[in-house]
Protein backbone atom coordinates (compact mmCIF):
# COMPACT_ATOMS: atom_id res chain seq x y z
CA UNK A 1 0.00 0.00 0.00
CA UNK A 2 1.35 3.40 -0.96
CA UNK A 3 0.20 6.96 -0.24
CA UNK A 4 -0.58 9.15 -3.25
CA UNK A 5 -1.35 12.85 -3.55
CA UNK A 6 -1.14 13.44 -7.30
CA UNK A 7 -1.60 11.55 -10.55
CA UNK A 8 2.19 11.41 -10.86
CA UNK A 9 2.57 9.71 -7.48
CA UNK A 10 -0.36 7.40 -8.32
CA UNK A 11 1.43 6.21 -11.45
CA UNK A 12 4.72 5.89 -9.55
CA UNK A 13 2.99 3.70 -6.93
CA UNK A 14 1.53 1.50 -9.66
CA UNK A 15 4.86 1.23 -11.48
CA UNK A 16 6.56 0.49 -8.15
CA UNK A 17 4.33 -2.54 -7.60
CA UNK A 18 1.84 -1.26 -5.00
CA UNK A 19 -1.19 -3.52 -4.63
CA UNK A 20 -3.24 -0.68 -3.17
CA UNK A 21 -3.11 3.07 -2.65
CA UNK A 22 -4.57 5.53 -0.18
CA UNK A 23 -5.29 9.19 -0.77
CA UNK A 24 -7.30 12.12 0.57
CA UNK A 25 -9.64 14.69 -0.89
CA UNK A 26 -11.08 18.03 0.22
CA UNK A 27 -9.15 18.44 3.48
CA UNK A 28 -10.74 15.92 5.90
CA UNK A 29 -7.68 13.69 5.87
CA UNK A 30 -4.39 13.49 7.71
CA UNK A 31 -2.42 14.29 4.55
CA UNK A 32 -4.14 17.62 3.93
CA UNK A 33 -0.98 19.67 4.46
CA UNK A 34 1.70 17.12 3.65
CA UNK A 35 0.69 16.48 0.04
CA UNK A 36 -1.44 17.74 -2.77
CA UNK A 37 -4.98 16.53 -2.46
CA UNK A 38 -7.41 15.33 -5.03
CA UNK A 39 -10.98 16.65 -5.29
CA UNK A 40 -14.23 14.72 -5.44
CA UNK A 41 -14.11 15.25 -9.20
CA UNK A 42 -10.98 13.05 -9.31
CA UNK A 43 -12.53 10.05 -7.54
CA UNK A 44 -13.94 8.19 -10.56
CA UNK A 45 -10.71 8.63 -12.54
CA UNK A 46 -8.54 7.41 -9.63
CA UNK A 47 -10.73 4.35 -9.09
CA UNK A 48 -10.75 3.62 -12.84
CA UNK A 49 -6.94 3.82 -13.03
CA UNK A 50 -6.64 1.54 -10.01
CA UNK A 51 -9.07 -1.01 -11.44
CA UNK A 52 -7.28 -0.94 -14.78
CA UNK A 53 -4.07 -1.92 -12.96
CA UNK A 54 -5.69 -4.40 -10.56
CA UNK A 55 -5.07 -2.44 -7.36
CA UNK A 56 -7.36 -1.28 -4.57
CA UNK A 57 -8.17 2.35 -3.77
CA UNK A 58 -8.68 3.63 -0.23
CA UNK A 59 -9.94 7.13 0.55
CA UNK A 60 -8.83 8.63 3.86
CA UNK A 61 -11.45 10.48 5.89
CA UNK A 62 -9.36 10.19 9.03
CA UNK A 63 -9.31 13.51 10.86
CA UNK A 64 -11.28 14.67 13.86
CA UNK A 65 -14.73 15.62 12.49
CA UNK A 66 -16.40 18.67 14.04
CA UNK A 67 -20.10 19.50 13.71
CA UNK A 68 -19.47 21.96 10.92
CA UNK A 69 -17.57 19.23 9.01
CA UNK A 70 -20.51 16.80 8.89
CA UNK A 71 -22.04 18.00 5.58
CA UNK A 72 -18.63 17.83 3.83
CA UNK A 73 -17.89 14.44 5.42
CA UNK A 74 -21.20 13.04 4.11
CA UNK A 75 -20.56 14.53 0.66
CA UNK A 76 -17.10 12.94 0.52
CA UNK A 77 -18.31 9.52 1.68
CA UNK A 78 -21.28 9.64 -0.73
CA UNK A 79 -18.86 10.44 -3.56
CA UNK A 80 -16.59 7.58 -2.47
CA UNK A 81 -19.48 5.11 -2.56
CA UNK A 82 -20.65 6.39 -5.94
CA UNK A 83 -17.11 6.11 -7.36
CA UNK A 84 -16.80 2.61 -5.84
CA UNK A 85 -13.59 3.11 -3.87
CA UNK A 86 -12.51 -0.11 -2.18
CA UNK A 87 -13.04 1.40 1.30
CA UNK A 88 -12.71 4.59 3.26
CA UNK A 89 -10.16 4.81 6.07
CA UNK A 90 -11.85 6.54 9.03
CA UNK A 91 -10.87 7.72 12.50
CA UNK A 92 -14.05 9.40 13.70
CA UNK A 93 -17.19 7.54 14.76
CA UNK A 94 -19.32 9.97 12.73
CA UNK A 95 -17.54 8.89 9.53
CA UNK A 96 -17.72 5.21 10.51
CA UNK A 97 -21.45 5.38 11.31
CA UNK A 98 -22.33 7.30 8.17
CA UNK A 99 -20.29 5.04 5.88
CA UNK A 100 -21.84 1.93 7.46
CA UNK A 101 -25.34 3.42 7.08
CA UNK A 102 -24.93 3.79 3.31
CA UNK A 103 -23.09 0.50 2.78
CA UNK A 104 -19.62 1.94 2.20
CA UNK A 105 -16.87 -0.35 3.48
CA UNK A 106 -14.74 1.15 6.25
CA UNK A 107 -11.20 0.44 7.43
CA UNK A 108 -10.09 1.96 10.74
CA UNK A 109 -7.21 4.42 10.78
CA UNK A 110 -4.10 4.28 12.92
CA UNK A 111 -5.33 7.66 14.22
CA UNK A 112 -7.74 5.74 16.48
CA UNK A 113 -4.68 4.49 18.36
CA UNK A 114 -6.02 0.94 18.75
CA UNK A 115 -3.35 -0.66 20.89
CA UNK A 116 -5.05 -3.63 22.57
CA UNK A 117 -7.62 -6.35 21.87
CA UNK A 118 -10.30 -4.77 24.08
CA UNK A 119 -10.27 -1.56 22.04
CA UNK A 120 -10.23 -3.64 18.87
CA UNK A 121 -13.31 -5.59 20.06
CA UNK A 122 -15.17 -2.31 20.58
CA UNK A 123 -14.34 -0.99 17.10
CA UNK A 124 -14.91 -4.35 15.36
CA UNK A 125 -18.59 -3.45 14.92
CA UNK A 126 -17.55 -0.80 12.37
CA UNK A 127 -14.91 -2.47 10.19
CA UNK A 128 -13.28 -5.71 9.11
CA UNK A 129 -9.82 -4.12 8.78
CA UNK A 130 -8.02 -2.17 11.50
CA UNK A 131 -4.72 -0.29 11.20
CA UNK A 132 -3.16 -0.65 14.64
CA UNK A 133 -1.42 2.14 16.56
CA UNK A 134 2.00 2.96 15.11
CA UNK A 135 3.55 2.86 18.56
CA UNK A 136 3.12 -0.91 18.98
CA UNK A 137 6.05 -3.29 18.74
CA UNK A 138 5.87 -6.63 16.92
CA UNK A 139 5.34 -8.59 20.14
CA UNK A 140 2.31 -6.46 21.00
CA UNK A 141 0.93 -6.84 17.47
CA UNK A 142 1.34 -10.62 17.73
CA UNK A 143 -0.50 -10.65 21.08
CA UNK A 144 -3.41 -8.73 19.55
CA UNK A 145 -3.46 -11.09 16.57
CA UNK A 146 -3.48 -14.11 18.89
CA UNK A 147 -6.42 -12.67 20.83
CA UNK A 148 -8.32 -12.09 17.57
CA UNK A 149 -7.88 -15.78 16.78
CA UNK A 150 -8.47 -17.10 20.32
CA UNK A 151 -11.53 -14.92 20.97
CA UNK A 152 -12.83 -15.11 17.38
CA UNK A 153 -13.11 -11.32 17.10
CA UNK A 154 -15.05 -10.66 13.91
CA UNK A 155 -16.08 -7.60 11.95
CA UNK A 156 -19.34 -6.75 10.15
CA UNK A 157 -18.80 -9.44 7.48
CA UNK A 158 -18.51 -12.13 10.17
CA UNK A 159 -14.87 -12.82 9.33
CA UNK A 160 -11.92 -12.50 11.69
CA UNK A 161 -10.69 -8.91 11.94
CA UNK A 162 -7.70 -8.22 9.70
CA UNK A 163 -4.97 -6.07 11.15
CA UNK A 164 -2.52 -3.82 9.37
CA UNK A 165 0.28 -1.63 10.65
CA UNK A 166 2.64 1.06 9.46
CA UNK A 167 6.19 -0.12 8.81
CA UNK A 168 7.45 3.46 8.54
CA UNK A 169 6.16 7.00 8.53
CA UNK A 170 6.53 10.28 10.32
CA UNK A 171 8.54 9.59 13.44
CA UNK A 172 6.94 11.57 16.22
CA UNK A 173 7.20 11.76 19.97
CA UNK A 174 3.40 12.02 20.32
CA UNK A 175 0.84 9.25 20.37
CA UNK A 176 -1.07 9.12 17.06
CA UNK A 177 -4.19 11.23 17.10
CA UNK A 178 -3.37 12.78 20.46
CA UNK A 179 -0.94 15.60 19.61
CA UNK A 180 -1.63 19.25 20.31
CA UNK A 181 1.90 20.66 20.06
CA UNK A 182 1.61 21.80 16.44
CA UNK A 183 -1.72 23.48 17.19
CA UNK A 184 -0.35 25.20 20.28
CA UNK A 185 2.89 26.40 18.70
CA UNK A 186 1.91 27.01 15.06
CA UNK A 187 -1.93 27.12 15.06
CA UNK A 188 -1.94 24.07 12.77
CA UNK A 189 -3.74 21.00 14.14
CA UNK A 190 -1.91 17.70 13.73
CA UNK A 191 -5.24 15.98 14.37
CA UNK A 192 -6.64 17.68 11.26
CA UNK A 193 -3.78 16.73 8.94
CA UNK A 194 -1.78 19.91 9.38
CA UNK A 195 1.13 18.73 11.54
CA UNK A 196 4.12 21.05 11.29
CA UNK A 197 6.46 18.28 12.57
CA UNK A 198 8.09 20.52 15.15
Task: Annotate the PLM regions.
Residues 130-131:
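Acidic, glycine-enriched active-site microenvironments
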Residues 1-114, 118, 139-141, 145-198:
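Active-site pocket-lining/capping segments in soluble small-molecule metabolic enzymes
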Residues 127:
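A conserved catalytic-loop motif detector
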